Amino acid sequence: MKKEEKTRLRREKIITAALFEFATKGYQVFVINELCKVDGIAKGVLYHNFSGKSDLYLTCIQESFEKALAVFLGVDGQVPSLADYMERCHQFYQQYPEHSHIFFEAMIATPEELEADIAPQKAIFLDLNEQVCQKLISESKLKEHIDEKRAMAYLRLIQDMFRSYYLTVS
C-alpha cells in the first residue's frame, strides 16, 4: 500500500471516530485525549493530520454539510418543495445520524470560536431554506392579513424547531 493511501485511510479512521464522539458529546465536551484513548489513535498520527480539536471539528462539519446538501437537493439538484425538503431532512437524520447531529449542532449551536469558519457553509443552507420557503409561498395563496414577510418568519420558526428536534433526539 502506498504512503498516500495509508495516510488517507488513517485520516478517514480519525474522522469516523471523531464524527461519533462529536455527535455523542458535542464540540464543547469533546476531548482529543479521550478520542485517542477510546479509538486507539496515536496522538502523533492525529496531530500529523489535524492541527487540533477545531481543525478536526471543521473537517467533520465539512463532510456533514456535503452529505446534507447532497441529500437535501436530491438526485436532480433542484430546490425541493417544502414537503420533500422536510422528508429529506428526516432521511438525512436516518441515514447519517452522526453527520446529522453535527450538522444541526453547527446550524443551531455553533461554537462561538468557530462561527466565522462555519458561516460560509451555514449560509448555503440558510439560502436553501429561504429558496424552499419562497417556493412554497409563491405556490400558495396567503390569507389577506398574512403578507410574505410574516409567512417567511413563521416558516423560519418551524424550521428552527425542526432542527432543534433533531439536535436533541438521541
Located regions from the model:
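Helix-turn-helix
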Residues: K13, E21-D55, T59
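Short, basic, alpha-helical segments at the C-terminal edge of helix-turn-helix-like DNA-binding modules
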Residues: Q62-A68
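Short amphipathic alpha-helical elements of helix-turn-helix/winged-helix folds
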Residues: A17-E21, F92
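Short secondary-structure transition hinges
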Residues: H90-E130
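Amphipathic alpha-helical packing segments from all-alpha helical-bundle domains
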Residues: L69, E113-K141, K149-A153, L157-S164
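Hydrophobic alpha-helical connector segments
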Residues: T59, F72-E98, E148-L155
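Short coil/turn segments at alpha/beta junctions that flank glycine-rich nucleotide-binding fingerprints
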Residues: T24-Q28, Y96, E139
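N-terminal intrinsically disordered/low-complexity leader segments
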Residues: M1-L9
